[in-house]
Amino acid sequence: MEFVSTQIQSAYEDYEEKERHDRDIKKKLASFKSAEFGHNFAEQTSQNSNPRKRKISEKSQKERPIRSLNAQVLNMFHGNVELIKQQRALLKVLSGKKRKVNEVLKHVENIELENSTTHRDKRKIAGTRINSSTFPDDFGEVLYTKNEWDLLINSIRIRFPRLSATSRKTLNMITEKYNERLHSAEVSIWDASSMPPIQLTSDDIRVLHDLKEDDETEPNELESISDTRSVILTLSQALKQDTSKIVEEEQNIEEVEGGMPLSQGVEDVPDSEPEVLAKNERSIISLNSDMIVQSSQVEPIILSSDAGTPQRRRDSSQLTQPLEEPILTTHLKSSPALSKHSKTPTSTQSPIKLPFNFRESTPAIDQLPSFLDDWRGAVVSDESQEVVYSTAQNHSQTKSSAYSTARSNFEDNSTRKTLNTGENEDSITVLKKTIVPFYGKINPEKEIVYHSIEENEEGETREIKSKLMDRMRLPNNEEINVIPDSESDSEHDVSFLEVISVVKRREPELEGDFSGFNTNLFNPPRQDTLISLDENDSEEVFRSQSQNYIQLNNTQDQTQDPTSKQREPTNTQLEPDNEVVNDEETFEKWKLLLKSNPEIYQQIVTFKPLFLSEIIKFLEANGFLMPKPKDVNLLKRFLDTQSVCFTERARK
């Protein structure tokens, strides 16, 4: 109880002391605002502290806001210059701003400019004593020299970088910070005891990391050197030690224990024999390929280049072939190795794991592997035809055209079709292959009607409707390759039908190349893009896709014939002109004109849309008039074939 009472008493005394201090500060502030501050501080009264003011009516009375300390002083002393000067001098002394520090430093620098040594020399020459009020006896000894003062200022700036005019720091703050540094320096001796020296000797490192001496070796510790020791730098090699003893000990241990080498069929040879290294690498590749074949539970399917249907290999061990035998290049990946006759790395081929069977696991539709592209390119068509579109080379060309840019199409727009002009027959046989993706099962009970266009020798066209089952029964000149086996109970099973059909069309009677008349109505869907469909939507989508493929095959490879009759209205609504114009030459001239204009050419290669009206004006200025709508349509078709972005809107 006594302890609690003493604590309460001490807290009360502290509170009284704080209140007394606050009262003193308020009294000093009140005296500072009085008019006679500094003159008659003892005789000031409360009456003189508040000067009288003129009586002004309330309407005309308007007080100015006091926004600074000088304005407050002027308002208090009513323009008395002497009092204002005294108060300002007092405010300078009492204010804690940075200007006080600057004044002190400036005063010291002004004194220091008068060199103390010159004054001392003058005193010696004159032999008289200078007034002590101006220069004290110890003048020039207590004050700093200019170099010493510069060092002091720089040390203050380095130790206290936050000392600036904005932070309102004074010399008292510098003193406090300096005392704190001195106090912390006394404490830092305990921190230094826990820190090691900066430079460590080899003995210190050995003790610190618990390293062993060079002579100390444990009997159970074995060091193994791999066949790639020329590449991997061991610790013994880094320390420049002799590794011959270690190698001999390792060989003796292997002979005594009869242990197997690290890799079967690989010899440990020095770096100077590249032939043996290449042999070791080939043996490693064959071992890895055997492991891949043994671990796969799926019977692989490969495409033979001698037959039109895929063949199934029964023995999986045949996939691992020696490197000297020819292997199908589409199912190989290369690995660098050294040749026997040269030190330059050559490409050795090794078989890889073939694609999985769709019966085992069916992946997501949008995540099918990219090897399906190689399957489509590996299908071999009838070799008796002159124009074949199913080779791997042509397939890669058609695939690359899907990713071509506007610049490649604009600069190099050559046709990839080759016609058999050596034979003088009425018609030309062109082999067309379309890949039609089938999604899910095909229900034979549903009746699906497909539309196709057929052209006879006279040039007449007619529309043919066929059912799904009739479509599945192909004529003798068509064949179906199913890759892979699609007989599965899964609802989302996927199979690809590669339909290779023969289309007969008339040979153009006129001379010249009419490949520019190919109607590019739409871009065909990419064959390697699959979209998952429901069972209810498969009927309509399959009808539309097959119809698009058939129309594309018939419209892209038929030239304009002036004697042919107008076709019946189809979904594409083709209306060929009666006049035959060599559009290819016109397209080439337009292309050269557009390339000659740097602004238009830059917009083309940067995929910026051009205004159709400006292109028409540019061509008309160069002699190509377009009075008819069909000329404008021809220009639009030219821009479409060149993959040029344009808009028909007018420039704002």
UniProtKB/Swiss-Prot annotation:
Disulphide-bonded residues: none
Record function comment: Regulatory subunit of the SLX1-SLX4 structure-specific endonuclease that resolves DNA secondary structures generated during DNA repair and recombination. Has endonuclease activity towards branched DNA substrates, introducing single-strand cuts in duplex DNA close to junctions with ss-DNA.
Family to which this protein belongs: Belongs to the SLX4 family.
Protein name (database record): Structure-specific endonuclease subunit SLX4
Pfam families: Slx4
Localization per record: Nucleus
Entries under InterPro entries matching the protein: Structure-sp_endonuc_su_Slx4
The organism's place on the tree of life at top rank: Eukaryota
Key words, A-Z: DNA damage, DNA recombination, DNA repair, Nucleus, Phosphoprotein
Subunit structure, as described in the record: Forms a heterodimer with SLX1.
Post-translational modification note: Phosphorylated in response to DNA damage.
GO CC annotation terms, alphabetical: Slx1-Slx4 complex
GO biological process: DNA recombination; DNA repair; DNA replication
Source organism: Komagataella phaffii (strain GS115 / ATCC 20864)
Region (Disordered) location: 1-23, 37-64, 303-353, 553-574
Bias (Polar residues): 1-10
